[in-house]
Amino acid sequence: MTHLHAGLNPETIEKGRLELNENPDTLHQDIQQVRDMIITRPDIGFLRTDDAFILRFLRARKFNQMEAFRLLAQYFQYRQLNLDMFKNLKADDPGIKRALMDGFPGVLENRDHYGRKILLLFAANWDQSRNSFVDILRAILLSLEVLIEDQELQINGFILIIDWSNFSFKQASKLTPSILRLAIEGLQDSFPARFGGVHFVNQPWYIHALYTIIKPFLKDKTRKRIFLHGNNLNSLHQLIHPDCLPSEFGGTLPPYDMGTWARTLLGPDYNDENEYTHSSYNVIHVKHVPAIVEGEDSPKYMKRSHSVVEPGTLRHEEERENENTQPLLALD
């Protein structure tokens, strides 16, 4: 077993072989083939090219070297084109800290039965006077950077559940084509994570409308992994066992504590929102997340809200500003 597999259990190594075409005997050769392609993109600054880093891109693209390199190039190109987003991508950045403390994103301690990490977004918590959409996106990207250091998650992947309960039409009207495209480029096109599913629950009609509008920007593979459950959670439980879910989603775990992930990343900074030190989390150091204690069963239904690379693949920030910045949904 190569040192790059250190810490992986035999079952996960076998899963990597069967599902991702990962071969321990040719691992270093596969990595070097991707590294050798870097010279073909002198327009991009590849700031990290070590074996462990390149390996996560190979896993994200099932060891197709060309696709892995394209993803690697888009990862750094996205950061070059959006320098302000990544200038201080740390948990103690004021904007990121506010987003984390408001639960963007939530991260469950328990994984699902396939070993996937479960991320939560409670959309109605978006206070637009407090958090910009970009800062929420930055907090999500930082969280993914932290989590993807875990080799088990590089192979098993992630699940995202978005609860749209009480997400108002007014909030939805603030979502513009440019910021939605920024999120799609950052999460779908430029990050080495395997997303096994994106689950919408309690989505109102205007989220269906938003999803229809952004569908053309989604890859076919992404579209097939988006599930619209509405307010009946039986279909969600067919894909994610209730034992892995908090009570908000009809699961057997206690209600999700919005501060769990923020406390993990911020450490002693969590309780003081006005002081920002350099002792908090960054993308290099990984801390252990405290375990969550199981609770009692909860109902199966939730109330519906009354109130979704080649050069030039990614756009420069100034180009986005020149795009249509009108909301996708307009208030009367």
From Swiss-Prot:
Annotated compartments? Golgi apparatus, trans-Golgi network membrane; Early endosome membrane; Cytoplasmic vesicle, Clathrin-coated vesicle
Give the bilayer topology: Peripheral membrane protein
Query: Pfam families given for it?
Result: CRAL_TRIO, CRAL_TRIO_N
GO BP term, pick one: lysosome organization
Transmembrane helix keyword on record: no
Gene Ontology CC entries for this record: clathrin-coated vesicle; early endosome membrane; endosome; trans-Golgi network
Q: Basic and acidic residues bias: where?
A: 313-323
For the region Disordered, give the residue spans.
Answer: 300-332
Q: What is its main location?
A: Golgi
UniProt KW Membrane keyword: yes
Disulfide bridge positions per record: none
Q: What the protein does?
A: Required for normal morphology of late endosomes and/or lysosomes in neurons. Binds phosphatidylinositol 3,5-bisphosphate (PtdIns(3,5)P2).
Q: What is known of its domains?
A: The CRAL-TRIO domain is required for targeting to the membrane and for binding PtdIns(3,5)P2.
Q: Could you share any additional remarks the record makes about this protein?
A: Binding to PtdIns(3,5)P2 is not required for localization.
The protein's name is: Clavesin-1
